[in-house]
Amino acid sequence: MTDTAENQTQNNWQAGHPRSIRSFVLRQSHMTAAQQRAIDTLWDSFGIDYQATPADLDARFGSSRPKILEIGFGMGTATAEIARRLPETDFLAIDVHGPGVGNLLKLIDENHLENIRVMRHDAVEVVENMLQDGSLDGIHIFFPDPWHKKRHHKRRLIQAPFIAKLLPKLKTGGYIHLATDWEEYAQQMLEVLSSFDSLQNTAADYAPTPDYRPETKFEARGKRLGHGVWDLVFKRIG
């Protein structure tokens, strides 16, 4: 998949969904030569193209290991590190931004990781159309855009309608792990997840950061500036 072809796919999606409220903005970002080369040479091995019908994740990974969905991986550094720490778990990583996709593919190659597959598409459509019910053991959404202006809150990804779409895809006993450095968004996340009877908080409110989640450079810089970070881990109980 070339970056040009994927841009056309995204343009077609926008044309077909003019009234959709999306949680992301498609930025014009510079793709380095190394990132583009990674897409050109590694996509066939580690990329998954969007389809509007359910996909067999075990077949796509070539394994029956537990499956984790990661939505919004940025430049992919944390995703690659989590996959390295959890080699017996498969990760389906979704983002819309080309440089991040290229960088994650590059990291997969450099670290000899076999347990990541990458998609460049709107995660909401993937959840709605590609993921089979009960196919996921966990869901990671780390540092989604907080859309801090009140008039933009409707763009936030973590809202009840989206969680309602995710829940059927999650096995009983599976978990949802969210993280944010925006306190007001953390409160909203807590309220949204707590509103579902089929989800149980694993902590009294916010959870300690699990060992598998590395600290990102952005997160470390925020902590130096006195910013907090909030993790939430909820388990599906029914």
Swiss-Prot record:
GO BP: RNA (guanine-N7)-methylation; tRNA methylation
Q: Which residues form the active site?
A: D145
What catalytic activity is recorded? guanosine(46) in tRNA + S-adenosyl-L-methionine = N(7)-methylguanosine(46) in tRNA + S-adenosyl-L-homocysteine
Q: In which pathway does it act?
A: tRNA modification; N(7)-methylguanine-tRNA biosynthesis
Listed binding positions for substrate are K149, D181, T216, K217, F218, E219
In the record, what terms sit under GO molecular function?
tRNA (guanine(46)-N7)-methyltransferase activity
Q: What EC number(s) has UniProt assigned to this enzyme? A: 2.1.1.33
Q: Name one GO cellular component term.
A: tRNA methyltransferase complex
Q: Which SUPFAM superfamilies does the entry mention?
A: S-adenosyl-L-methionine-dependent methyltransferases (SSF53335)
Residues that coordinate or bind S-adenosyl-L-methionine: E70, D95, D122, D145
Family annotation (Pfam families): Methyltransf_4
Q: Cite the Gene3D superfamilies for this sequence.
A: Vaccinia Virus protein VP39 (3.40.50.150)
Q: Which domain of life does the UniProt lineage start with? A: Bacteria
Q: Mind listing the UniProt keywords for this protein, alphabetically?
A: Methyltransferase, S-adenosyl-L-methionine, Transferase, tRNA processing
HAMAP family attached to this UniProt entry? tRNA_methyltr_TrmB (MF_01057)
The family assignment reads:
Belongs to the class I-like SAM-binding methyltransferase superfamily. TrmB family.
Entry function:
Catalyzes the formation of N(7)-methylguanine at position 46 (m7G46) in tRNA.
Output this protein's name: tRNA (guanine-N(7)-)-methyltransferase
The top of its lineage is: Bacteria, Pseudomonadati, Pseudomonadota, Betaproteobacteria, Neisseriales
Name the gene for this chain. trmB
